[in-house]
Amino acid sequence: MKKKVLFIDRDGTLVIEPPVDYQLDSLEKLEFYPKVFRNLGFIRSKLDFEFVMVTNQDGLGTSSFPEETFWPAHNLMLKTLAGEGITFDDILIDRSMPEDCASTRKPRTGMLTKYISNPEYDLEGSFVIGDRPTDVELAKNIGCRAIYLQESIDLLKEKGLETYCALATTDWDRVAEFLFAGERRAEIRRTTKETDILVALNLDGKGTCDISTGLGFFDHMLEQIGKHSGMDLTIRVKGDLEVDEHHTIEDTAIALGECIYQALGSKRGIERYGYALPMDDCLCRVCLDFGGRPWLVWDAEFKREKIGEMPTEMFLHFFKSLSDAAKMNLNIKAEGQNEHHKIEGIFKALARALKMALKRDIYHFELPSSKGVL
């Protein structure tokens, strides 16, 4: 089997990069990145990646960065990591300055020649982990993808590097989860004589939504699911609204449910259960179970015929179709006077229940069922 590698940056990734001079040149400046020990130790013990440290240390060995100020902190860092089971198969340090344009300086690949075009290594299955766009560019240059330790990828978009970023996060918990269990993404295309629907989602996203169904109020409700569950959600619908709203709403629920079910995968490590949310004058309760047995209990009444362009009779139908397609048990109850608040509260409660139930723990990566199947 070919070897996979994690090419790991040092400053800003393993340790906090010192502000002002960006030099880790004293023991007082040594501060480890939050959660790095538990998660990198987990990756080292559970997965088959080689660990290679790849770092630029500007002017190391010159008067601006004497070696005697570098090695004590560096060696203590390595010793501390090793004490937690984190060792490196190779450590590559470039000492040049940016203006030198050295072939060995990241994002150039001169230090990595032993891994490039080497049949023993699976670079497509490898990752660069780092906090700078140059780390993502290095991933591009050696033919792998990057885990970018930043929240925003705006800088990557400016440089045309966003497609080489597999994950953007500042949380080592997410890094370990991604490498161990993968991202829970899915895409469903549902086409009938009445509708053409695309649903794409990432259960481990940031709540980014791009929704267009042709029904403004329905869009607003679906946005609550993405925003308040934390999933990235794209829904594009072309439906026969010239007939009525029924097919658009029903088929969207089916496609969304199928997409959630597909993205869930094995369900290992998930919480499985979730519940609840009050809103203004309303109390809306949603309890759910991803146990594989669809069922809907609905206790909510609406006096108006429509809210926005959405018939209130379709609310129950939406959640029944969603429950069936996602193979989840839903129990929904809403009390209150304001009809808009009531249904919006239900959608928000569903979202928060989803967030709770979909939470995944790789350190307890078991199926949440005594039967051994969900």
UniProtKB/Swiss-Prot annotation:
Residues 1-183 are annotated as: Histidinol-phosphatase. It catalyses: D-erythro-1-(imidazol-4-yl)glycerol 3-phosphate = 3-(imidazol-4-yl)-2-oxopropyl phosphate + H2O; L-histidinol phosphate + H2O = L-histidinol + phosphate. Its cofactor is Mg(2+). It is found in: Cytoplasm. Gene3D superfamilies: HAD superfamily/HAD-like, Imidazole glycerol phosphate dehydratase, domain 1. Residues 184-374 are annotated as: Imidazoleglycerol-phosphate dehydratase. SUPFAM superfamilies: HAD-like, Ribosomal protein S5 domain 2-like. One of its GO terms (biological process) is L-histidine biosynthetic process. Keywords: Amino-acid biosynthesis, Cytoplasm, Histidine biosynthesis, Hydrolase, Lyase, Magnesium, Metal-binding, Multifunctional enzyme. GO terms for molecular function: histidinol-phosphatase activity; imidazoleglycerol-phosphate dehydratase activity; metal ion binding. PROSITE patterns: IGP_DEHYDRATASE_1 (PS00954), IGP_DEHYDRATASE_2 (PS00955). CDD domains: IGPD. Its EC number is 3.1.3.15, 4.2.1.19. Mg(2+) binds at residues 9, 11, 131. Pfam families: Hydrolase_like, IGPD. Pathway: Amino-acid biosynthesis; L-histidine biosynthesis; L-histidine from 5-phospho-alpha-D-ribose 1-diphosphate: step 6/9; Amino-acid biosynthesis; L-histidine biosynthesis; L-histidine from 5-phospho-alpha-D-ribose 1-diphosphate: step 8/9. InterPro entries: HAD-like_sf, HAD-SF_hydro_IIIA, HAD_sf, His_synth_bifunc_HisB, HisB_N, Histidinol-phos, IGPD_sf, ImidazoleglycerolP_deHydtase. In the N-terminal section; belongs to the histidinol-phosphatase family. In the C-terminal section; belongs to the imidazoleglycerol-phosphate dehydratase family. HAMAP family: Bifunc_HisB (MF_01022), HisB (MF_00076). This is Histidine biosynthesis bifunctional protein HisB. It comes from Bacteroides fragilis (strain ATCC 25285 / DSM 2151 / CCUG 4856 / JCM 11019 / LMG 10263 / NCTC 9343 / Onslow / VPI 2553 / EN-2). The gene is hisB.
